[in-house]
Regions:
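Active-site glycine-rich loops that stabilize anionic/oxyanionic intermediates
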Residues: 23-26
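Conserved alpha/beta-hydrolase
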Residues: 28, 35-61
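Alpha/beta-hydrolase active-site loop
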Residues: 66-86
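Alpha/beta-hydrolase-fold enzymes
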Residues: 101, 105-193
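Short beta-strand/loop motif that positions the catalytic acidic residue
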Residues: 220, 226-228, 232
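Short alpha-helix in the alpha/beta-hydrolase fold that links the catalytic acid
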Residues: 222, 236-246
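Catalytic active-site module of serine/aspartate enzymes centered on a nucleophile-bearing elbow/loop
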Residues: 254-256, 260-296
Length: 296
């Protein structure tokens, strides 16, 4: 089963609905603050947890391991959640906010069902993951070989089970209180202790990347906002720029591209003034009616 958090706005006329697609090793509760800002602006918010994360179902008994058998499972599950949301709010537009791995999942979902989404916000999306010091072709080749020989549930080399380690200095956030809040939650709740990828996940991430870069970009009709962090160690910036460029050159819709100075990969985990600017960009984009298409 897919676990999903629901936050309903208490205003009389909500602006719409936002579905959040979280990132690798994350969970719905990490996005409490993100949900709060959308609620304040008059949106209902839903946060489904992807397979292998939080309280959703898993394909492995190891609570530290993020494993998937096929990338399509992520997309099917996410669209199933979106279908439920659309049925619950048939008169409201559905908007997508997606981060990192969730950007790949949400991005493909919006390519499979372009008419479902009113506007799409991709924050540090995983158009192509970075693979540390291993070249991308070598990393994907190793992952494929492991999957072929039945070792898809093995930890990727150099990765390990959750042990409570990790520091703010090496994290993807720039706000220490925001970082420490989730670190403490993770230490207290076993279901939040997803930590490392399997070779099956690595191969699935490669297949999602190829789909987005070869096919997905052609299918969008909803206006898109893509926000890139200044310091980025987890996703390819070149892939982000190429992805946005192809969407804009095709001309079916627009992809606004913003480079956020003073941020790391988790832009939503930034400090004061930078975070205010980030949310300013997002709500200006959502409030802009110039390119609106009715996708209810």
């Amino acid at each position: 089963k897919i676990h999903m958090l629901q936050y309903l706005s208490d205003i009389d006329m909500p602006k719409g609905v936002v579905v959040i697609s979280h990132g690798f090793t994350e969970s719905a509760v990490k996005y409490d603050e993100v949900a709060y800002y959308f609620l304040k602006e008059g949106y209902h918010v839903y946060i489904p947890e992807h397979c292998g994360h939080g309280r959703s179902y898993r394909l492995t008994a190891d609570p530290s391991l993020v494993h998937i058998d096929t990338w399509r499972r992520y997309i099917r599950d996410f669209l199933k959640a979106c279908r439920y949301i659309k049925k619950a709010h048939p008169d409201l537009s559905l908007n997508l906010y997606a981060h990192s791995m969730g950007g790949a999942i949400g991005g493909i979902a919006a390519a499979w069902e372009p008419d479902w989404f009113h506007k799409v916000i991709l924050s540090s999306p995983m158009i192509r993951p970075l693979t540390d010091n291993v070249p991308w072709p070598a990393a994907t080749g190793i992952a494929l070989e492991k999957c072929i020989f039945g070792k898809d549930e093995e930890y990727v080399a150099g990765r390990k089970p959750y042990d409570g380690s990790g520091s703010f200095e090496t994290s993807s956030a720039t706000s220490k209180p925001r970082y420490e809040r989730y670190k403490n939650l993770r230490a207290e709740h076993k279901e939040l202790q997803t930590w490392s990828p399997s070779y099956g996940w690595l191969w699935a991430s490669a297949e999602m990347s190829w789909y987005l870069r070869l096919y997905g970009w052609k299918k969008y009709t909803a206006p898109m906002l893509l926000i890139q962090a200044q310091t980025e160690d987890l996703v390819s910036v070149r892939a982000l720029k190429n992805f946005a460029g192809k969407i804009n050159r095709q001309g079916k819709t627009s992809c606004d591209y913003i480079h956020m100075i003073g941020t790391k990969h988790e832009i939503y985990g930034s400090r004061g003034k930078i975070l205010e600017k980030y949310w300013g960009y997002i709500f200006t984009f959502l409030d802009d009616t110039e390119n609106d298409i009715d996708h209810r």
